[in-house]
Amino acid sequence: SDFMSYENFSTLIDKIAEFSGEAVISLSLWGESTLHPQLDLFIEKILSYSGLSVLIELSELNLSDEKLNKISQIVKNSEARTNGKEKIYWIVSVDAANQEVYEKIHGKNSSFEQSCSAVLKLSSLFENCVYPQFMRLKENEESLETFYRFWKEKNDEKLIIQKYDWFAGFLEDKKTADLTPITRNPCWHLRRDFVILLNGDVTICREELLNSSQGNVFSESLENIWQKRKTFLEDFVKGNYNQLCEKCDEYYTFNF
């Protein structure tokens, strides 16, 4: 299946709430979570725990007005958060200031206008929780200032300028600037993230695109899987980087 079932997801959220208590659940690891037919139920399940928030990243809005209004009502009806976060966050990958540049990044059949419309529509329903995002690339660097000025005024200064992630050398290097710290600090993602695939397998981090399962959340406890990760973090702190970590420059980035 291309989707995690609601039954499995519900079980997983119960486990996360017990394990962490306070967490931000990102539904958009490498794909478009707005394509999931039960997205509204997923959001409702997450928000049933006052210590959990939800993050959704998208490039285009694949949700009907009916589904959006339903999600908006779910968010409004849920309790205030106890984790210091908003109930829900939306990040829209705009990445451009015009159609020509947008097509270079998102493909010929993509629509810059629809991406901008997604930001505005979401902002009308989820006030102060929507962020247009610009990922800096060689293809769009000249559009950065235009993007920044427009959305700073249009969206009450809520926007994200994101560095390019080349997945530790798996993708072509399209970075426009080297932003890495002089001193390499312990990886934020090893310390804070828990990457779960739709079949329940857990990878060491989101940069690991190939086989590296640390366990499965549906057959093991989250505590046991988390303990397995400690070796990687301890090695990182000591400067003993594995092949993936050696090439990776995401260690200083984080969302929450």
What are these regions (language model features)?
Residues 188-191:
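Short, small/polar residue-rich loop motifs at catalytic or cofactor-binding pockets
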Residues 16, 42-47, 71, 119-126:
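Hydrophobic positions in alpha-helices of CheY-like receiver
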Residues 196-199:
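Short, acidic, Ser/Thr-enriched surface-loop or helix-capping motifs
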Residues 1-6, 21-36, 50-65, 79-117, ...:
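Core AdoMet radical
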Residues 1-8, 19, 205-210:
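Canonical Radical SAM [4Fe-4S] cluster-binding loop centered on the CxxxCxxC motif
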Residues 12-30, 232-240:
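Short Fe-S-cluster ligation motifs
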Residues 67-72, 138-153:
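Catalytic cores of alpha/beta
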Residues 117-130, 149-182, 201-255:
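C-terminal accessory region of radical SAM enzymes
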